[in-house]
Amino acid sequence: MTEFESTRDVASQLIVAAILIGVFALLAADRVHRVLVPLGAVALVWLISYFTPWRLISFEGARLAVDLNVILLLFAMMALVGVLKTTNVFPWAVDRLLVRSRGNPSRALSFVIWFTGVLSALLDNVTTVIFTYPMAASMAQRLRINGSAFLLPMVMAANIGGTATLIGDPPNVLIGADPRSGLTFLSFIENLAVACTFMLIVLVWYSRRYYPADVGSAANADRPEAIVPSGAELQNVPLLRTTAWIALAILLGFLTHSLTHMPVAVPAVIGVAAILFAQDYYYLKDHKPTAEERQHGVLAILEKDIEWPTLAFFLFLFILVGAAVSTGMIESLAHALSWTVGRISSTAGLSPRATLLVAALLVLWVSGFLSAVIDNIPYTAVTIPLVASLLGHLEAGTDGQVLWWALALGACLGGNGTLVGASANLIVAGIAERAGERIAFMRYLVVAFPLMLLQIAICHAYVLWRFF
């Protein structure tokens, strides 16, 4: 059968919506492995697409829907962390961090949250959690507390910190790259950094309240037994030094994205290829392995440290969201938002400034909720033209830049709401599952969704204070 154009009628959109609702229901029920849920959904989408009149998405459309930039970035960062593990740098760093915190869980959590938030603003939230997970998990283990008390605040801090800069979260990259927004790297920091800093403070408070026995007032005491050195020493220092220099080059590639316009996967893949070659060189030089022993070198990293199930989950999830885009479902939601703004404005006889306020708050809240249930990357890509259209209908002289900030805040922070709301959430869940610390959909939801509502409410107040 030849490839086809997706049908964009209401029936096709309702079918895709029903499938997505089913996916979330199955993930919440937690009865089957999370990878099987989107896999089965994609199979159902193609059965419908190729054997019924409703053409949801073709194979070619699915291929284009998969964000190879995200998949390759994740692969590269997982491989980089795998190489760093062979140098023993993470246990070595944890020893020193616990000494600095005097074994106090509350103080240690504050460090994890602030370190993750700042690093996420400089890199991006996905790369950050891949790097910080080994340290956060090790600190929780050494302190003998619930791993979720460190891991969930860590991933939320990554999503908050990434909101502050143009390169910290993919929605911001899309918004900043669109010439209609007119936004720069500095303008993101100027307009969003204050809000994100306050939300990190709130996250520290919320985490201590939610986990009082682990990191709250009941645990706010030094634990001398936790700062006894584990005896971890750095191994293969030449490889660590080489990896550090190449990692700095990768970071430079990330930071110059607005100038080079290279997808972030490009410097990541180039850098990790060099690192893997270096790892293989030092391994052969130091060990003189037999053919069988060599299986413990690069192949061990590729087999054990790459979260293949998580990458598969992303691949199938991208296809499902691609079906929502190709059938026009997301576009219909965006137009419904535009219609609502116009209806409220005309019915209430609002002034241009009041109309702008209504539009900004609707964009903020709708983006927050939708980004919690669908991938925020295609949502943002489809909503950018809507925001530009809303700006075109504003009266001359009205500064509509607030709509871009509302979109950025809602799309980025909405990802904190559910386990599938942001790529960083799924990465942490995948790595934790392999380590025996399973983070179920509902377990994440009951912790994170109330915080997401609080964050969006804070952004609501911030938009009013900062722009009106």
What are these regions (language model features)?
Residues 25-32, 115-124, 155-167, 364-379, ...:
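Transmembrane alpha-helix interface/packing and boundary motifs in multi-pass membrane proteins
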Residues 13-17, 36-40, 71-72, 106-114, ...:
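Hydrophobic alpha-helical transmembrane segments
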Residues 3-12, 29-34, 57-70, 183-194, ...:
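Interfacial loop-to-helix junctions that mark the boundaries of transmembrane helices
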Residues 57-148, 309-395:
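Membrane-embedded alpha-helical segments and adjacent helix-loop junctions characteristic
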Residues 28, 145-148, 152, 163-167, ...:
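Juxtamembrane and boundary regions of transmembrane helices in multi-pass small-molecule transporters
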Residues 199-301:
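Long, contiguous bundles of hydrophobic transmembrane helices that form the permeation core
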Residues 12-24, 31-55, 67-79, 240-250, ...:
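Hydrophobic mid-bilayer segments of alpha-helices in multi-pass membrane transport proteins
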Residues 4-18, 66-79, 122-129, 165, ...:
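Structural signature of hydrophobic alpha-helical transmembrane segments
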